[in-house]
Design a protein with these regions (language model features):
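Charged phosphate-binding loop/patch that engages nucleotide di/tri-phosphates or the phosphate backbone
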Residues: 1-3, 101-120
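Active-site metal-binding core of divalent-cation-utilizing nuclease and nuclease-like domains
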Residues: 31-38, 47-48
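A structural signal for short, well-ordered beta-strand segments and their strand-loop junctions
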Residues: 33, 53-55, 103
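Catalytic cores of nucleic-acid endonucleases
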Residues: 57-102, 107
């Protein structure tokens, strides 16, 4: 399990960020990390068709169906939760505890506010 050694959600998020950076770097994309942590995205990735804001999420949570569920809400530095707003980021990159990754465009997330169930 990918998050076995993680002692809190912040360390789990750090593992997710590392996985995302490795994923995009292996594709040959340039990855930039914003200077601060107050925006609603974690990375800026240079895709062939331009720069994309990428939000990285991790999950160990499963629905009753056994499929992974990932929350879309973002947390501010003061522990405030914000529901997903279209345009907050261009790409959602998800990492499960098994190391499986998923990418969703903002178009694919239309209609969702709090969470999505991953396909498998």
């Amino acid at each position: 399990m990918l998050f076995t050694e993680c002692t809190n959600s912040q360390s789990q998020g750090n593992v997710g960020m590392g996985q995302a950076i490795a994923h995009y770097t292996q594709k040959g994309y340039t990855v930039s990390i914003p200077l601060n942590d107050c925006q609603e995205y974690d990375l800026v990735v240079e895709y062939p068709d331009g720069l994309k804001k990428v939000q990285v999420k991790t999950t160990k949570s499963k629905a009753q169906s056994g499929k992974y569920v990932v929350g879309l809400r973002t947390m501010s530095g003061y522990k405030d939760k914000y529901s997903y707003k279209i345009g907050s980021y261009d790409i959602l990159f998800v990492v499960t505890e098994l190391g499986k990754t998923y990418e969703y465009t903002s178009k694919q997330l239309e209609g969702y506010k709090n969470c999505i169930t991953l396909p498998d």
